Amino acid sequence: GIRMEINDVTVTLAATDRFRLAVRTFEWDPFAQFSDSAVLIPSKRLSETAKTFAATSTAPVELALGGTDEELGGEGLLGIVGENRRTTTRLLDAQFPPFRTLLPQSHTAIATMDIASLAASIKRVSLMSDRGAQVRLAFANGEVVLTAGGDDSGEAEETLPVRYWGEPMTIAFNPSYVLDGLSVIEDTTVTFGFTNPNPPAII
């Protein structure tokens, strides 16, 4: 499921597949004072609803949680109302992992680079590795060296410029996971935050 945390200023969505954690926070404007709430929503239903609303209108949507109005969001329901339609979904009665404990509050190294160049390089070097094998990124001296492979199939290597702060570091990623993350960033550059090569990195 997708965890939705709501207060009177922001809505935060969090989801995980046990290997990756995605978090998105955006502002909203409630009609009335809103007490802090956290619910778990079926991910497939919420994703389908978002796609349907986005395809039919660009107008803002309304959220309704709890209360007695079954049409908008009765007890145990989340209501979503758009310009031309409305829908409700039943909430899940389950616990979501305490995801904020997985997000480091500080970093020992930070790297910023061009998204298009990085994505293209990852796609090229990963051709030399087996499906699901990792791509290694070595950061140092204003550049990052991407490598993959190294067995009988050969090895691929590419170098890209990077704005890097921290000690030299090599970290390995599943290329598909990185490409998925890069594909949803609405910018031309991406910043990675590291604590050391082993714990998860933040994009």
Feature annotation, model-predicted:
Residues 1-25, 31-92, 106-203:
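DNA polymerase processivity clamps
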